[in-house]
A protein has these predicted regions:
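Sec/Tat signal peptide C-region and signal peptidase I cleavage site
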Residues: 18-22
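Extracellular S/T/G-rich loop segment that most often corresponds to the catalytic His/Ser-adjacent loop
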Residues: 116, 121, 129, 239, ...
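N-terminal domain-start motif of subtilase-like serine proteases
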Residues: 52, 63-69, 90-119, 139-153, ...
Length: 539
């Protein structure tokens, strides 16, 4: 087949494709010596844009739709036709999977200086290497300590998902360039609970400091009229409140997430599956990444883990509460860890199930084991907590596949090295981790369309969400996975006009757009930071 026929076939193949332009990829085309001019002439005639020419290497770079490659391979003079692969700067910075999943890496935050997110949580470690360059102010509730310190680490993790700085360290957030304004209200100390009245006071503080979006990775099962009316008032003032749906893995409503004027956020994993701990209610509105979320924690409070067998490195996650340290020894199969195994001076390999992670580690420790590796009994990473149990050996979790591979190496005369070290970053699970993804996306979209109201942004997020699970809205994922670029495209196309009818019917009477206060008093109820049930997981 000659060049003319090949190009004619190619042009016919793509002429009916509406997605041909969007589907283009960059390829390296190397041709026979002396045939460069002929190949280039026909490519230009066919409408191709040649990106670069390497005359000394008899090659050029072109961008073509993927479906055209097979046709181009038939050109007689072509010796190499391969994709022009990307290369990256090698840095220690990681982009958490959630950033790309919600399309934050597809949208510029160059207009974010006009937006403010208020985070109500356990504080913000201002000295953190990935957070210190942000534009941030803060307040503290009585008795909770300084807002710029975080004894718990929860609030710092949330803040990192929203605004970790793009500085070649650690991670990046949804708005990573230090332009977004943050206001921190610290209502929790290291104990991780406060009252509903504290939350209302924190919300008032957010309003007083001009917040556009309020992020709350917290909640409790008892509703409060006083609290409900405060969020209705905030919504009427143009503020968008976002809260975690809850980590009970059931259908109970959690508050403030289940108030009509608050966006309730469910958690999904990297594969867009619903997290088994995520609440499923008729108030769930949007979903976001909440499983194995890597973000900032108080400096040195995180844990990094590594396991090597000879020169082979394996991915591992330090168990929450694990001691720091490095251990080496042989590898011993200890089953489920329910019965003694001969582990003196060695590392225990234990399967997840039946008893707690702490009990497995204690059994290993009692038999003289120097460290423990617990492998998952289902697909995926294993993130676990040892709780308050005093375990004195390093403990890590690995996937089911890594566990199976390690079992296959038990007979090898090799030394296993396991290390748990201090880190400024950590993997957390929970709807607490999903919530800042939605709050951050809301702020990012709003910064690109400041003419929209909070209701307009809310409806755009709903309309543009990626539908997951059942067709349409469902109790597990709401309208679906929040998407920044899709929401902006939706507004670009349709504007941000608000529909008259909202999906959620208001359960309480309103006057003039503000909540009518029907009651003069309400019980002050406790609420808490949201942690998943992994700390007590037995199987």
């Amino acid at each position: 087949m000659n060049i003319k026929n090949v190009l004619l076939t190619f042009l016919l193949a793509i002429s009916f494709s509406q997605s041909a332009v969007a589907d283009k990829q960059q390829y390296i085309m190397q041709f026979k010596v002396g045939k460069g001019a002929e190949v280039r002439a026909y490519l230009v005639r066919a409408g191709f844009q040649i990106q670069r020419h390497f005359p000394q290497r008899h090659a050029l770079i072109i961008r073509v739709p993927a479906k055209a490659i097979e046709a181009l391979r038939k050109i007689p003079h072509i010796e190499i036709l391969e994709q022009d692969h990307r290369r990256y700067l090698l840095s220690t910075q990681q982009v958490p999977y959630g950033i790309s999943l919600v399309q934050a890496d597809q949208v510029s935050d160059s207009n974010a200086a006009s937006s403010k997110v208020c985070i109500i949580d356990s504080g913000y470690q201002l000295a953190h290497e990935d957070l210190s360059d942000n534009s941030v102010t803060g307040s503290s509730d009585t008795g909770s300590g300084n807002w710029y310190e975080d004894e718990n680490g929860h609030g710092t993790h949330v803040a990192g998902t929203i605004a970790a700085f793009n500085n070649d360290k650690g991670v990046v957030g949804i708005l990573p360039n230090g332009l977004l304004q943050l206001h921190i209200v610290k209502v929790f100390d290291a104990q991780g609970w406060a009252y509903s009245s504290s939350l209302v006071a924190a919300l008032d503080d957010c309003l007083a400091h001009g917040a556009d979006v309020v992020s709350m990775s917290l909640g409790g099962f008892k509703k409060s009229r006083f609290e409900r009316d405060a969020f209705s008032d905030a919504y009427a003032r143009g503020v968008l409140s976002v809260a975690a749906a809850g980590n009970g893995g059931n259908s109970r409503h959690l508050y403030p997430a289940s108030y009509n004027d608050v966006i309730s956020v469910a958690a999904i994993d990297q594969d867009k599956n619903v997290a088994n701990f995520s609440q499923q209610t008729d108030q769930v509105e949007l979903s976001a990444p909440g499983v194995n979320v890597l973000s900032t924690v108080s400096m040195g409070a995180g844990r990094s883990a590594s396991v090597t067998i000879n020169m082979d490195a394996y991915s591992a996650k330090a168990m929450g509460g694990s001691v720091l340290g490095e251990s080496a020894g042989g590898l011993v199969d200890c089953g489920l860890g329910e019965t003694p195994c001969a582990a003196r001076g060695d590392i225990c390999l234990i399967k997840r199930g039946n008893i707690t992670y702490a009990d497995k580690a204690l059994a290993c420790q009692a038999e003289g084991g120097v460290a423990a590796i617990i492998y998952n009994n289902t697909a995926g990473e294993l993130l676990g907590m040892l709780g308050d149990v005093a375990v004195h050996i390093p403990v890590v979790g690995v996937t089911d596949l890594i566990g199976a591979e390690m079992l296959g190496r038990l007979g090898e005369a090799e030394t296993v090295t396991l290390k748990v070290a201090a880190s400024n970053y950590a993997f957390f699970n929970g709807t607490s981790m999903a919530t800042p993804h939605v709050a951050g996306v809301a702020a990012l979209v709003w910064s690109n369309h400041p003419e929209c109201s909070n209701e307009g942004i809310r409806q755009a997020l709903q309309a543009s969400a990626e539908d997951l699970g059942e067709v349409g809205r469902d109790n597990a994922t709401g309208y679906g996975l929040v998407k920044a670029e899709a929401a902006i495209d939706h507004i670009n196309s349709l504007g941000c006009a608000v529909e008259c009818k909202r999906r959620f019917k208001r359960k309480w009477p309103f006057i003039g757009g503000l909540a009518q206060h029907l009651y003069s008093t309400a019980a002050t109820r406790p609420f808490s930071l949201l942690y998943p049930r992994m700390a007590a997981a037995l199987k």
